[in-house]
Amino acid sequence: MRIGFDHEKYLEEQSKYILERVNNYDKLYLEFGGKLLFDLHAKRVLPGFDENAKIKLLHKLKEKVEIIICLYAGDIERNKIRGDFGITYDVDVLRLIDDLRGYDLEVNSVVITRYSGQPATNIFINKLERRGIKVYKHEATKGYPTDVDTIVSDEGYGKNPYIETTKPIVVVTAPGPGSGKLATCLSQLYHEYKRGNVAGYSKFETFPVWNVPLKHPLNIAYESATVDLKDVNMIDSFHFDAYNKVAVNYNRDIESFPVLKRIIEKITGEESVYKSPTDMGVNRVGFGIVDDEVVKEASKQEIIRRAFKTACEYKKGYVDKETFHRAKLIMEEMNLKEEDRKVVIPAREYAAKLKERANKSETCTVVALELEDGTILTGRSSELMDGTAAVILNAVKHYANISDEIHLISPVILEPIINLKAKTLGSKRTALSCEEVLIALSICAATNPTAQVAMGRLPMLKGCQAHSTTILSTNEEQTFRKLGIDVTCDPEYISESLYYNN
């Protein structure tokens, strides 16, 4: 893989800049946008970026940092899903707490925002409290977003309970956008000043990258990733007016800046040190780019990937038609097409060939996989196994120089598994999934040296690209994710079944 980003340089620059910012205050509330862990988007568009860079940064500052996690009550009620992991936001909070503790980071509490006694939210609160985790409930702020006098009063932020913190940097994070991070930071700022403490607010958001051109593919890829939020990158006019320098930000931050500035000035009783939304940020990711061409190409591929993802989400009913069309439009505006993703054409051509040979109405899933050396392999679904499993077996055979004719998994192992699924468990779909095939392969590896060699090649699939001609089940997507394979799908179901497709 060609590297476009210097991870070590970025970590050094970023930690230094955060510490410089905290020196101005007794306490700094740092709003962390994007993903704190497993930032797969950043990893894809910035080759060389560590997906856990942010948490490693916090680990470096662990003596000075504690963490508050925000979760919007409405997201619990509607079971909002974190797309890259296929888990709900409330479950992601539990995962996040475990992961933060694994990095020796102190989790202060969980804040439920815009709380109004929702039943599912109460169950989640009970679950946390009974495991010894502090939970604070913040209701919707009266007067927000325009009535600053009410917002900054005992009727507004004053109604929220004060969260007791002890360290100079308080990181406020969440599973996703719209979780109430900013409101929590400002509420805390209000309470700090009421107590006579000098506190500050800053924002750490990786994208858009403020010191990269507006129409750079890296920033356009961010628009594509947030197409459901309708985010649009813009030139920060406040920054240009104050410093005569061009900086990129996004519409929500620019639109809310005048009110945000007034709220901060009302809380502190003095003029804000921030002249623009860009001033509020502490992001230094742009300084880690070492090969712009590599980043551009990776970002273009991400735009195509996002268009596929949005098309599938539209088919599943998760997003509206406007979001679907916008993702496609962003791709077309960059003069990109679906076929610019190398694995798309081989998958579609093989699927078309199979359809010609078989019943015209039958749909067969074909998965194409591009290896690091540029080789493209395919696998098809059959009565025995899914297309995902077939292509993985083909890939490990390729890496281990094992002939196609050699069976890696003994029928003695496969038949009892299929019988178990069909007869004992009564499953309608008896074809083995990718995960089931990998488990079967690992059993065979105990007695078959060839299978053992093939198993040893699985880590080589990390970073590979794949495309499926039909929508994959959540389970198949997660298996590919665990293997480190980026997969896209055509927005077609394998059958007309409504339930058994998944």
UniProtKB/Swiss-Prot annotation:
InterPro entries for the chain: DUF1846, DUF1846_C, DUF1846_N
Pfam families in alphabetical order: DUF1846, DUF1846_C
Cleavable signal peptide: none
Superkingdom field: Bacteria
HAMAP family: UPF0371
Protein family per UniProt: Belongs to the UPF0371 family.
Protein name, per record: UPF0371 protein CLJ_B0384
Provenance organism: Clostridium botulinum (strain 657 / Type Ba4)
